């Protein structure tokens, strides 16, 4: 962990608002089609209830110590409206946040939490419409002692996340788009989504079968 005096960073690079808005209109499936596999979080980090609202925004990163949640509780007062708080938790046995912390984060404009760890009071956040993605839930609260970090690179769901990267999460999964590549990825994903939207099921079926049959033939399969 970083020394306390350098542990909290607030001056981070951020994507242009129009880029963030563009990603808010895209499903993770459209984005994952145009990024590498290392940008998609593992399925262990998942929505904590069905039909969860999609979130997309700049990553506000947090690292907590084992059995501790101090830095996440500090982050809710430091994140900007629209930020997605992304957490590398120290373990998955004690909750790093509960109903009140989530409610305050929502009141202050945070888009949602993505936690490589566990959360509690899920029913309250579901009722309030505050999106939570995590490994799971635990009724046990963590301590508030530290150490920890805010806005340093972290690893969440197997993906390295830098402050200011764009994070998109929905029922299908979670994708992290590096800040420097965000405009390029947005353009490709929008084009892919538009093309897919214009393709009828009949046309897709015809193209799909032709590709499958050609691949089978090229590899020597019969039948």
Q: Model segments located where?
A:
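Feature captures the catalytic cores and cofactor-binding loops of soluble hydro-lyases/lyases
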Residues: 2-163, 177-223
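C-terminal binding/interaction regions
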Residues: 167
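Channel- or pocket-lining gating/hinge segments that regulate access to a cavity or pore
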Residues: 173-175
